[in-house]
Amino acid sequence: MGKTQNGTPIHTITIFANPFLTNKPSLEDIGVYKVSPGEDPPSEGPWHTLYFLPGIHDIGVGFPVHSNKTYFIPGDAIVYGTMNNNKDDDDGNHILIYGHGTLSGDRLPHPNFADPPIPEDEHWKYHSITIQGVKRDNITNTYVFNNLEY
């Protein structure tokens, strides 16, 4: 239930239109590692795709991602935590994190307000993601900020 500007309750529905995924990995493919809710996903191994199965996952802070690996989050999966390559410039190429699911830092404390305090040299693990080399190819990938399209 939402509220109008004047505080009167209203019923709302939000619909997000996303294109069908044409490159969704198959659970039967060799090299696809299936991560069940509650399981600690492996950060390395002979797999090429880490597939988070439906449900709620908690990967913690700074789950390591690696070059030439794919991380798939389907629409019925929520992954709490952060992903990074531990500042290794040689291990940060051709990483694909995709799907219609949710990758959220909601369960993590803000590093400036955590109790006990998070050491300053660990704050980088909590920073927002930096994406380079993204191709925008349809309206669902369009960013709108202050009524300006990017």
Positions of the model-derived regions?
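Extracellular/periplasmic carbohydrate-active domains that bind, remodel
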Residues: 1-150
